[in-house]
Amino acid sequence: NSEVGINYFDNTYRFRQDSTFLYFFGIDQPDLAAAIDIETGEEILFGNDVTIDDIIWMGPQPAMKDKGENAGVQIVKPLDALSAYISDAKNIGRKIHFLPPYRYHNKIQLNKLLGADIDRQKELASVEFIKGVVALRELKDSYEVAELDKAANIGYIMHYTAMQMAKTGMVEQELVGLMEGIA
């Protein structure tokens, strides 16, 4: 997923990473893509290191290679290498599996990468891939259950704090700030 502008490019809504991307790679950052080659077993993360302009605003950030390694991905390439990677796979007759996109930016990207008609992408999505993701995500191991419990507890604390702190005349954003501070 990429950031989405509210009224111009650099004034964005709060970023929310795609849940399936988070499930498989655990990296909550915009402008990333990944490929899992089921024939070779390779996992490839596509993303760019921050620029000096980014560092001025955000401070030093881990390199993409380090983020990939933390996610268990050994191969990391710049985002603009994705197009050549997909093109090479298509040229040797490999089937490209993808999940149904729900954001327009991703639909446009799929159109550019695969030539998939935007209006037909839902039906062109890989049923095999969808079923595989569902099979993985429907059963939880003890680690996943512990993470769900932790998230539920944080949500409880956030909402309970908001209820305790709410006062007449208070601006909603003040409560949102308190809740975000807990998260």
What are these regions (language model features)?
Residues 1-157:
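A composition/biophysics-driven feature that prefers long, compositionally simple stretches
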Residues 1-7, 149-183:
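Active-site cores enriched in adjacent His and Asp/Glu residues with nearby glycine-rich loops
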